[in-house]
Amino acid sequence: QAVLGPAHLGRMGTPPPDYIINEMKKAPKRNLPLTESIGNGLCRLNLDSIHNHLRGETIHTLFLATAEEHQGTLDELKEQLTLWKNNSIFSEEETTAELLKLEESNYAPVSHSQPYHSAYDPHYRLISERFIKYFPLLERIDQRLMHGEKTLLAIDGRCASGKTTLAALLSRIYACSVIHIDDFFL
């Protein structure tokens, strides 16, 4: 996951936002950390912990943005698999057999096993860790939207502080207009 990120999007097609919304409703409310870093700039956003904080549409957009931005390579995957093989807790025969299956599948994304699903009941989405710092703001906006409130937002900050990056993300998530004050020569 740390190498390929949400790679299964390319093979399965993009799930609609309703898919995440329904999964959020089904996910048990557990005391899990909101996010868990998995390396390479990615984290798992636990849907179990996000109830009533972010809208499914917001999570969906963060997930899609991550899938577009994070393009791991086969060489990176092979490098990580070599590290895993050299440090595996499994026997050399088991490790070699699993790696051979993966190679024969042309390195298709791997799903969680049934025993894993039964033991952990995972409900998460992979997102870029760079989005985490925006969660307090996204939560406030989503809360207003969930209550039917219109929202107008002004972003102020120093030069190169990330205002344009944040505005672009907000525009993507909420399909809103962005007006850059720099364009008005005040």
Where are the language model's segments positioned?
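P-loop (Walker A) phosphate-binding loop of NTP-binding proteins
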Residues: 158
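Long, basic/Gly/Ser/Thr-rich N-terminal segments
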Residues: 1-113
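Active-site signature of alpha/beta-hydrolase-fold catalytic machinery across serine-
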Residues: 169
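Short beta-strand-centered segment that lines the nucleotide-binding/catalytic pocket of NTP-utilizing
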Residues: 174-186
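Conserved lysine of the Walker
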Residues: 163
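N-terminal pre-Walker A segment at the start of P-loop NTPase domains
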Residues: 119-146
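Short hydrophobic/aromatic beta-strand immediately N-terminal to the Walker A/P-loop
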Residues: 152-154
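Hydrophobic positions on the alpha1 helix immediately C-terminal to the Walker A/P-loop
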Residues: 166
